[in-house]
């Protein structure tokens, strides 16, 4: 009986400790939000679009007026171009006390007017300092003598898969909404979306239309990325969100501030994935690297001696595991820089020196 009582006593002591111990390991998101939300902004954008309309011989007649068909047949009335304004929006965040703001390029592209709203309902018109489509980063500025809150930028290279992260933004115009989750993957390449130069952070944080341009925080309250896009089969959140790492975005910001444009490295090759079957046929071992399918004429790759069928194993001393790693690495190298590369050709690893070119915009 004593043993039974003693056992029950131990259980009574242990069970409450187990039930309360879980709370110690949960992130204190409430304090983080209180400390950071004042510097998260809503970005309202006005755009002017042109539409075409056909002139009616009966102005003011209702749509489908019977004589419209009579007067328009068989001759086509000239179409008139009209301008109309449309509104859209997203999120952003203040990064300096003098009013610099980060958001996405796709949030402010083609904007004729940009208005920034803070959570205390203050509003400011913003100027577009620079915007880069390939990185989906845009830099705005508001000019005011008023005191502005701003956020600290963290080190996105330090985050680990499984770390807690928090997002604040304005999904579906529900301003300053908070969601949280964990990092699912790092350096995710999504070439099919035209974003092959962005080493995305993937997370399961709920991101929806309107969250674009908002910050992703670590638990220190530091910004580690700019929320940009989701994977979805129907347009809504499905548990897969993508964020531009702040370290990468900072490189873009510096160029936009100083030059107004962004320069990227260029190699001049098209590549494909090395499958297991290809790796076996090459006697490469484990599948890895980027298989060159085509070398452009007069490109940096051709001048360096790269050939079709070469497998690039490393570039600028960075290993290439998947083919999508190569454009991420090359794009971040300053043009005219000479770097080391390791390739696999005819069963042998070979070291090469490559002078990186500049990626020209296609007009």
Model feature map: region roles:
Residues 101-105, 300-323:
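Conserved PDZ fold ligand-binding element
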Residues 310, 338-340:
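A general secondary-structure boundary signal
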Residues 311, 351-352:
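Residue-level detection of beta-strand scaffold positions
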Residues 1-7:
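Bacterial N-terminal signal peptides that target proteins for export
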Residues 9-13:
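Hydrophobic helical h-region of N-terminal Sec-dependent signal peptides
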Residues 20-281, 285-288, 293-297, 323-327, ...:
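Serine-dependent protease modules
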């Amino acid at each position: 009986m004593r043993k039974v009582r003693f056992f029950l006593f131990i259980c009574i002591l242990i069970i409450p400790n187990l039930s309360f111990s879980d709370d110690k390991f949960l992130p204190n998101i409430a304090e983080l939000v209180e400390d950071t939300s004042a510097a998260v902004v809503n970005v309202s954008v006005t755009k002017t679009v042109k539409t075409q309309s056909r002139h009616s011989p009966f102005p003011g007649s209702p749509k489908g007026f019977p004589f419209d068909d009579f007067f328009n047949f068989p001759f086509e009335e000239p179409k008139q171009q009209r301008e109309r304004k449309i509104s859209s929006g997203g999120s952003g965040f203040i990064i300096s006390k003098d009013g610099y703001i980060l958001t996405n390029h796709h949030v402010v592209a083609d904007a004729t007017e940009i208005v920034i709203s803070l959570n205390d309902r203050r509003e400011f018109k913003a100027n577009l300092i620079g915007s880069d489509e390939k990185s989906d980063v845009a830099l705005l500025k508001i000019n005011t003598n008023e005191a502005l809150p701003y956020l600290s930028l963290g080190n996105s290279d330090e985050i680990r898969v499984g770390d807690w992260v928090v997002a604040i933004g304005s999904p579906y115009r529900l301003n300053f909404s908070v969601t949280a989750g964990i990092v699912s993957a790092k350096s995710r390449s999504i070439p099919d979306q035209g974003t092959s130069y962005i080493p995305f952070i993937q997370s399961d944080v709920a991101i929806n239309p309107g969250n674009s341009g908002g910050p992703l925080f670590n638990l220190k309250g530091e910004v580690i990325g700019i929320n940009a896009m989701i994977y979805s089969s129907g347009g809504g959140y499905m548990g897969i969100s993508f964020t531009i790492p702040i370290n990468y975005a900072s490189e873009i910001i510096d160029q936009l501030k100083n030059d107004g444009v962004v320069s990227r490295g260029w190699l001049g090759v098209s590549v494909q994935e090395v499958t297991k079957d290809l790796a076996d046929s090459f006697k490469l071992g484990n599948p890895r690297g980027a298989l060159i399918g085509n070398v452009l004429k007069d490109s940096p790759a051709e001048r360096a001696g790269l050939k079709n069928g070469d497998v690039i194993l490393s570039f600028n001393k960075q290993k290439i595991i998947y083919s999508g790693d190569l454009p991420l690495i090359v794009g971040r190298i300053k043009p005219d820089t000479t770097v080391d590369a390791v390739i696999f050709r005819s069963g042998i690893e070979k070291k090469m020196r490559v002078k990186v070119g500049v990626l020209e915009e296609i007009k």
